[in-house]
């Protein structure tokens, strides 16, 4: 029986409607996250941006996203309202900008994305109880659907060079989601942690640090690929924007497929650690191939393979990190990498006058991940008890 002041339970119909709308909004944030990377060739021409300045736009968006994850409070619905409100305001500023790039608007755009995505994830987790892991896997897949479909859905606006209409469509969708959250959503009761669980998590900072670095690098690679693949493909010989955007779509399609595959029993059969080792190796190999063979057809193939390899990586690392802490900063650490590596890619590209050299930044992130995994495997081998020597 609910005591006075407790939060009323949602009816099954309301819960289903809420899950549907929140999932649709989460998928929209997937498309909105990759939007800047897909539009970057057009926006660079419109606002006369160098690669370094274009990288700064990506940096501001993902920095805002990381800050949004940190700023997401315990009241998930209020954070959702603020997030979608910021998205609507920043999108209107971007839509009506003229000769100069609205740098501040992209920072607040990322802030809104970070708050909306993190609050949705935590609200679904609060409502799911013991099924929270499965729900998070489903949410990651839904987000990937939006990220995959986004580049193709943006193409009609790119063909007409009418990006303002795209921004206005997104503005209307964000306003609809804002209205739903403000009028229909209710805060869910949070699961409490026992003192023993908090104490156990406090003592695992040493185990958490490598996971944090891995998450920063994994999301940094994902953001750099998403942000620069269209531009890289365009310069490598895919002259039409449709063909260039196809590389980004193939990357997200590969990621979506792998997340779908690993949301089944496949992950349990292979094992989390074995999957982690294999995907990190695959990411590094595909990144090296991307800069080694910059032909249009090779880029399309490698983009799909890179997406397949990187797809399960962040959800897998997130599952390891959530065993130690379930706070919003866990979602923010990936955003730090997502802010740094796309910007660093643009800065290196401007310095060396070659985007191939710029893509050494995500290659370095892949190398860091491989080295960390090698060290972890060596430590596990050393810590393992020696097998008994059989007597003659």
PLM segments and residue spans:
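C-terminal transmembrane helical hairpin of 12-TM major facilitator-type secondary transporters
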Residues: 273-317
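Interfacial helix-cap and linker-helix signal at transmembrane-aqueous boundaries
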Residues: 43-44, 75-76, 153-161, 233-234, ...
């Amino acid at each position: 029986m609910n005591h006075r002041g407790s939060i009323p339970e949602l009816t099954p119909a309301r819960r289903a409607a809420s899950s549907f709308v929140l999932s649709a909004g989460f998928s929209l944030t997937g498309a909105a996250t990759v939007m800047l990377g897909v539009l970057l060739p057009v926006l660079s021409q419109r606002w006369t941006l160098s690669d370094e300045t274009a990288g700064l736009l990506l940096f501001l968006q993902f920095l805002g996203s990381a800050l949004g994850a940190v700023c997401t409070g315990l009241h998930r619905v209020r954070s959702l309202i603020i997030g979608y409100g910021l998205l609507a305001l920043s999108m209107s500023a971007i839509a009506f900008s003229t000769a100069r790039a609205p740098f501040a608007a992209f920072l607040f755009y990322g802030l809104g994305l970070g708050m909306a995505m993190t609050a949705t994830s935590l609200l679904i987790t609060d409502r799911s109880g013991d099924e929270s892991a499965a729900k998070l896997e489903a949410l990651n897949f839904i987000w990937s659907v939006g990220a995959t479909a986004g580049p193709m859905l943006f193409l009609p606006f790119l063909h007409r060079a009418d990006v303002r209409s795209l921004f206005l469509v997104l503005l209307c969708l964000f306003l609809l989601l804002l209205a739903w959250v403000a009028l229909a959503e209710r805060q869910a009761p949070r699961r409490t942690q026992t003192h023993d669980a908090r104490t156990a998590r406090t003592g695992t900072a040493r185990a958490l640090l490598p996971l944090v670095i891995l998450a920063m690098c994994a999301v940094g690679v994902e953001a750099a690929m998403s942000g620069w693949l269209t531009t890289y493909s365009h310069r490598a010989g895919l002259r039409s924007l449709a063909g260039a955007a196809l590389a980004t779509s193939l990357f997200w399609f590969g990621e979506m497929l792998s997340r779908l595959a690993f949301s089944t029993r496949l992950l349990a059969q292979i094992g989390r650690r074995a999957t982690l080792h294999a995907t990190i190796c695959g990411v590094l190999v595909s990144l090296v191939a991307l800069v080694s063979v910059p032909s249009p057809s090779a880029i399309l193939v490698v983009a799909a393979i890179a997406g397949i390899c990187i797809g399960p990586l962040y959800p897998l690392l997130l599952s390891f990190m959530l065993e130690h802490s379930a706070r919003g900063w866990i979602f923010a650490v990936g955003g730090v990498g997502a802010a740094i590596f796309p910007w660093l890619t643009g800065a290196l590209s401007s310095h060396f006058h070659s985007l191939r050299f710029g893509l050494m930044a995500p290659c370095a992130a892949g190398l860091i991940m491989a080295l960390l995994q090698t060290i972890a495997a060596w430590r596990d081998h050393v810590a393992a008890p020696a097998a008994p020597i059989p007597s003659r």
